[in-house]
């Protein structure tokens, strides 16, 4: 199939029609009309009294032509509508995407691993006062795609420097995986009902979405399915779906950590036995708090809301990274390894644990030089390293987990990234 030689995708993203790349909004902290005190007199220019003696009573102001700012028509979400002007669109030669090509057998073996999804948020400062903001899910047990390859593909699509922004994107993904992994890897018991209540607050351009949700931590319902139904009911665009799903994933991970520590809140019920009761039973306001609310805010308020939420997310990530005490049962893993690999008890005793709590991290100066002894992936392509047959810190996360579970290195990953 023929493909175009040029593309305008990267420049069209900067026109304001999407939430992926947006202009930075300067948030004013004080009013210009307020009195600034005595120090403000230092900025007053000196008066030349000699000009008054020569008869120049008034200075003639010099008018400098101001450059007209381009005005875009925006919708109720604050996004530009209509066809972008030709001055902002410029074509460039399309580059071939460097994918990692694997065989069907390798894909089949990779699909056997359990998927553990972690919410990832990117917030990267770009040139010309632009900002890259994106949210997506990353499989902690991903077997083929690495943060480095993902960053290279994203930079190629957005026409960004891989050396500058590729490193920032990959390091941001690895850091968030390291912080969420201890909580995300803990499996929840099936068949039990664990109801929790949490609030959602998402900033969608100039729209502020607020909602209160009751969720079952053991439910097979995914946040993605919930976000699709919510956006369809409220008439929101497709860009709002990953934002809402990301916010739900964050809340669920936080509540999952509280559930593992036995700190889930109890909901009081003063109802008569046999009558309807629950956190959503409200006869006074008829459940007004349980309905989604959309509000249009200014750009300054939207920026403040995003900053406040980002601070809360950073605080929660620090708490999640300190989560411990719920590592996988090492004896059970050794028993499973003996059953799968037909190993003796003495051989399985030397196997490491597959839990994230037993993994190790590399220093930033070690990552560019480190490579996995089996699949040959770089240290920047894995969020943690593990012990293997050749010693400590010799395997990446994917190879190390397979070795800990089966006692054998995965044959299909041999020299995968050579």
Curated annotation (Swiss-Prot):
Outline what the protein does: Component of the chromatin structure remodeling complex (RSC), which is involved in transcription regulation and nucleosome positioning. Controls particularly membrane and organelle development genes.
Q: Which GO terms describe its cellular component?
A: chromatin; cytosol; nuclear chromosome; nucleus; RSC-type complex
The coding gene here is sfh1
Under the heading SMART domains, the entry gives: ZnF_GATA (SM00401)
Q: What is this protein called?
A: Chromatin structure-remodeling complex subunit sfh1
Q: Transmembrane ranges? A: none
Q: Where in the cell is it found?
A: Nucleus; Cytoplasm
What keywords are assigned to this protein? Chromatin regulator, Cytoplasm, Nucleus, Phosphoprotein, Transcription, Transcription regulation
Q: Does the record bear Nucleotidyltransferase in its keywords?
A: no
Gene Ontology biological process terms, A to Z: chromatin remodeling; heterochromatin boundary formation; regulation of transcription by RNA polymerase II; transcription initiation-coupled chromatin remodeling
- Where in the sequence does UniProt note compositional bias of the Basic and acidic residues kind? 64-78
Listed under subunit, the entry gives:
Component of the RSC complex composed of at least arp9, arp42, rsc1, rsc4, rsc7, rsc9, rsc58, sfh1, snf21, ssr1, ssr2, ssr3 and ssr4. The complex interacts with histone and histone variant components of centromeric chromatin. Interacts with sad1.
Answer yes or no on keyword tRNA-binding.
no
GO function term, MF aspect, one:
zinc ion binding
Family of this protein: Belongs to the SNF5 family.
Q: Where do the segments described as Disordered lie?
A: 57-81
Entry-annotated residues carrying Phosphoserine: 269
Matching entries from InterPro entries are given as: SNF5, Znf_GATA, Znf_NHR/GATA
């Amino acid at each position: 199939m023929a493909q175009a030689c040029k593309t305008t995708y990267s420049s069209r993203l900067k026109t304001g029609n999407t939430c992926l790349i947006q202009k930075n909004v300067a948030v004013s902290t004080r009013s210009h009309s307020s009195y600034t005190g005595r120090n403000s007199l230092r900025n007053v220019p000196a008066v030349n009294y000699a000009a008054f003696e020569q008869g120049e009573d008034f200075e003639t102001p010099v008018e400098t032509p101001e450059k007209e700012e381009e005005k875009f028509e925006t919708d109720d979400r604050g996004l530009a509508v209509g066809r972008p002007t030709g001055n902002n669109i410029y074509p460039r030669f399309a580059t071939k995407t460097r994918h990692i090509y694997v065989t069907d057998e390798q894909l089949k073996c990779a699909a056997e691993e359990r998927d553990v999804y972690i919410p990832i948020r990117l917030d990267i400062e770009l040139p010309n006062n632009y900002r890259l903001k994106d949210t997506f899910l990353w499989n902690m047990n991903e077997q083929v795609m690495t943060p480095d390859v993902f960053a290279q593909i994203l930079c190629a699509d957005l026409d960004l420097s891989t050396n500058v922004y590729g490193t920032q994107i990959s390091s941001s993904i690895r850091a968030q995986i390291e912080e969420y992994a201890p909580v995300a890897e803990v499996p929840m018991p099936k068949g039990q009902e664990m109801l929790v209540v949490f609030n959602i607050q998402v900033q969608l351009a100039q729209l502020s979405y607020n909602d209160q949700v009751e969720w079952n931590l053991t439910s097979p319902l995914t946040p993605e399915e919930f976000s699709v139904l919510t956006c369809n009911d409220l008439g929101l665009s497709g860009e709002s779906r990953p934002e809402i799903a990301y916010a739900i994933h964050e809340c669920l991970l936080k509540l999952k950590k509280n559930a593992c520590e036995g700190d889930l809140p109890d909901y009081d019920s003063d109802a008569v036995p046999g009558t309807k009761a629950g956190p959503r039973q409200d006869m006074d306001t008829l459940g007004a708090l349980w309905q989604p609310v959309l509000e249009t805010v200014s750009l300054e308020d939207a920026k403040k809301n995003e900053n406040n939420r980002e601070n809360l997310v950073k605080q929660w990530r620090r708490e999640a990274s300190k989560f411990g005490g719920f590592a996988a049962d090492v004896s059970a893993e050794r028993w499973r390894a003996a059953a799968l690999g037909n190993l003796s008890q003495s051989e399985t005793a030397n196997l490491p644990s597959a839990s994230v709590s037993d993994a190790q991290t590399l220093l930033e100066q070690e990552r560019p030089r480190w490579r996995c002894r089996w699949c040959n992936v770089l240290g920047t392509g894995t969020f943690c390293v593990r012990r293997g047959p050749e010693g400590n810190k010799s395997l990446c996360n994917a190879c190390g987990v397979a070795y800990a579970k089966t006692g054998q290195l995965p044959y299909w990953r041999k020299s995968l990234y050579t």
